[in-house]
Amino acid sequence: MPVFASEVEPYAIAVTTSRFPKMQHLGNVTEIHGDLILPVDVLTFGSPCQDVSVAGKQAGLHEGKRSSLFFEAIRIIQEMRYATHGKYPKFAVFENVPGLFSSARGADFRAVLQAFVSLCDDSVLVPEPPKGKWLHAGEIVGDHYSLAWRV
């Protein structure tokens, strides 16, 4: 079973190398090609939170230089799915801060949901949140996908 990480910070690499000596480090996420990675059932990732956190300047998911790395992970998943004819990864898990729900008045979280839904069905549009605010838990289910979130 392949186990890999994308990290550029030397200390973080040292920690994972110490705790997971067989982990392969793929380097900068912007330079990874998903079609060249061995297929995996589960892909987990996070993106820097500074641009969507209430503690930061809230530049947003699209305008922020750090949090926009989310879209690099989505690109890698798209490339993996294309290379495996939609089979892998079977599951993707994304982690970030609760501020993502309110960043850009909820539009950033909707963009996250839309990116995930579009991996399987790009004809589906994620609706606006109920009453203008995202719930702390929810789901979107389609014919070829299911998506859930929880704080």
Describe the residue ranges of each PLM region:
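SAM cofactor-binding core of SAM-dependent methyltransferases
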Residues: 1-32
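Residue-level marker for buried hydrophobic side chains located in beta-strands
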Residues: 4, 25, 43, 92-93
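Class I S-adenosyl-L-methionine
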Residues: 32-42, 52-151
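Short glycine-/small-residue-rich Rossmann-like dinucleotide-binding loops
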Residues: 47-48
